[in-house]
Regions:
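Short beta-strand His + acidic residue motifs that chelate non-heme Fe in jelly-roll/DSBH
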Residues: 50-52, 70-71, 87, 92-99
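A short, N-terminal "cap"/entry segment at the start of jelly-roll beta-barrel domains
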Residues: 1-36, 116-120
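Conserved short histidine dyad/triad with adjacent acidic residue
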Residues: 40-55, 89
Length: 120
């Protein structure tokens, strides 16, 4: 068993062409410590988000702080702390804090899932 204190996790800048604005990542469990999952926190500063993309596995988002948006090709939904979102494998989507408040979420995916960016 391993207990992780989120308040003690280092925040690293998430520099990637997938993100717009200032985004930070906190790895909850090192990929070498689990056989099944990628598990981290993504912290979106106000005005930041990721671009449209899709994954080869389902993705679960658990909003831990703030208010943000999760969008697909068909809809945009406002989400806030306590909301849980299931994004099926292959669904084109984006998520983040495009408005005036920051938003953080835990992301859970199957280990080995691939991400395809679909927005320049």
């Amino acid at each position: 068993m391993k207990v992780v204190r989120i308040s003690e996790l280092p925040r690293e800048s998430a520099i990637s062409p997938l993100f717009t604005g200032e985004v930070f990542r906190q790895v909850i469990v090192d990929p070498d410590e689990t056989q099944s999952f990628n598990f981290s926190i993504v912290n979106f500063s106000a005005g930041s988000r990721n671009k449209f993309h899709q994954h080869t596995s389902d993705q679960i988002l658990i909003v831990t702080e703030g208010t943000g948006v999760v969008a697909t090709d068909q809809e945009e939904r406002t989400v806030s702390a306590g909301d849980v979102i299931l994004i099926p494998a292959g669904e084109n989507h984006w998520h983040g804090a495009p408005g005036g408040t920051p938003m953080s979420h835990i992301t859970v995916q199957t280990k080995g899932s691939q991400t395809q960016q679909n927005e320049p």
